[in-house]
Amino acid sequence: MSVFINKDTRVIVQGITGSTALFHTKQMLEYGTNIVGGVTPGKGGTEAEGVPVFNTVAEAVQTTGANASVIYVPAPFAADAIMEAVDAELDLVICITEHIPVLDMVKVKRFMEGKKTRLIGPNCPGVITPEECKIGIMPGYIHKKGHVGVVSRSGTLTYEAVHQLSEAGVGQSTAVGIGGDPVNGTNFIDVLKAFNEDPDTHAVIMIGEIGGTAEEEAAEWVKANMTKPVVGFIGGKTAPPGKRMGHAGAIISGGKGTADEKIKTLNACGIEVAETPSVMGETLIKVLKEKNLFETCKTH
């Protein structure tokens, strides 16, 4: 088991003929992801990396039976690309694109109300179920199949946590990058719920950062509902107030959203928080050992 994606996920790539999309399409295919088509308006009938290209998402879905899409469309056109995928009734849309205007995403969120599609991102590294399916831009080779779920607002911190776990012989069920923008499709709680219900996930690492209250809300949810151990990390301890730190959502405003505040809430909700990024894996392994879960989480 895993969450959101597996070896049977049938993927289309929106914006497939762009250089970034072509590079990552090749990487995803090499990993074993089942990419069944691509979409670039005006390029229908051609091929990219051996994958058929269509003019519209609807046409691609109708022809290939795709149930998921990954979007590498430039920011000014990305919101339209998401809505086109939602209109085509895909189960899952993963948007990698950064710098989508916030107002565009507000419109997308409203458009998606009551629709069946789950959006992950934007401004995210994607989702990977190790040794089955990789959708996005993460380096596949650092992942190992196993029982730890990873959910994060940061791409590179996800890779850091995953690499530490894999090096210690602890595999992952699924790693989900929810993205660093203030308005996104899937939040921490959505992913934690999925991990909680997944029999193959035995523990979770949640990686947050300054800005907003998503981590605090997730911690309260964990305290009330989670049956599996969760370990946390919060980036941005030394960030000055009022300065955006890399991600559009990573900003301390009005004294709210500081790392200290978040860490305090996580601790109060029973979530052990790693002091620095370099001990994220170590902190989880310590908790696994305390709960006698380490052996079941080791990849044999």
UniProtKB/Swiss-Prot annotation:
Protein name as it appears in the record:
Succinate--CoA ligase [ADP-forming] subunit alpha
Q: Which organism is it from?
A: Bacillus subtilis (strain 168)
According to UniProt, this protein's pathway is: Carbohydrate metabolism; tricarboxylic acid cycle; succinate from succinyl-CoA (ligase route): step 1/1
Q: Which residues are recorded as binding substrate?
A: 159
Reported function: Succinyl-CoA synthetase functions in the citric acid cycle (TCA), coupling the hydrolysis of succinyl-CoA to the synthesis of either ATP or GTP and thus represents the only step of substrate-level phosphorylation in the TCA. The alpha subunit of the enzyme binds the substrates coenzyme A and phosphate, while succinate binding and nucleotide specificity is provided by the beta subunit.
Q: Which InterPro entries match?
A: Cit_synth/succinyl-CoA_lig_AS (IPR017440), Citrt_syn/SCS-alpha_CS (IPR033847), CoA-bd (IPR003781), CoA_lig_alpha (IPR005810), NAD(P)-bd_dom_sf (IPR036291), SUCC_ACL_C (IPR005811), Succinyl-CoA_synth-like (IPR016102)
Q: What is the lineage of its organism?
A: Bacteria, Bacillati, Bacillota, Bacilli, Bacillales
Positions binding CoA in this chain are 17-20, 43, 96-98
GO terms (molecular function) for this protein are:
nucleotide binding; succinate-CoA ligase (ADP-forming) activity; succinate-CoA ligase (GDP-forming) activity
